[in-house]
Amino acid sequence: SFIASQCLAHGELTGFGAFHPDLTPAQAQQALDQIKELGLKGVKLHPDFQKFNIDDRKMYPFYEMIAGKLPVLFHTGDDRYDFSSPTRLARVLSDFPTLTAVAAHFGGYRRWDEAQAVLPKGQVYVDTCSSIAFIGVKRAQELIRHYGADHVLFGTDFPMWDAKDELAYLEEMDLTQEERDLIF
C-alpha cells in the first residue's frame, strides 16, 4: 500500500506490486486482486532475490492468470545467477504470447548480447535502469534502436542509482524528440 499511496500523491509515478512465487494459485489470485484494487499497474518479479527460475513450470499458473491483464516487470540478467536469464524469459514469452513483459536492465543486466539475440522484439519491453553506466551511451542507444523506442521505458532503480544520473545518460544520446517522448 506504500507504493500505491506514493503513486496517488505523485501522479507522474507508475507503481507495481510485488508477488511471491511460492503463493498457491488462490493466494496468487488474491494478491493480483489486491494489486488491482490498489490501483497498481503491474507486478514486479525479481527471480535472483526470490530464487526461482523465470521459466519454472510452477510459475505458469501465475502467467496464465496475468497474461493479457497486467504487465510483469522481470529483473533480468546478471551473470552471477541463471534464475533470470534472458533465454529463460524468451521461453516464457514463447509459451505465453499475450503476456506483457518488461525485461529490466535493457533485457538482461550484464547479459545484453544474449538478451538482444533471444528476446522477441515487439513482444517484450525493456527498461533503461542500472545499465547505461556499464554499457555506455553508444551501446544503450544501439539497444534502444534494436528494441524500438516504443518498447523502451525509462527506469532508474532508485534508490540504488540517482535518477539525475540516469537522466543525464539519456540526455547524452543522439535520440530524436519522438524517441525521447516514447521512452518517457
What are these regions (language model features)?
Residues 3, 35, 43, 66, ...:
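Conserved, mostly hydrophobic/aromatic
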Residues 33, 146-153, 160-184:
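Mid-to-C-terminal alpha-helical segments outside catalytic/metal-binding sites
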Residues 47, 130, 156-158:
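Short secondary-structure boundary segments
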Residues 18, 49, 130, 170, ...:
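Short, flexible active-site loop motifs that bind/organize anionic cofactors or intermediates
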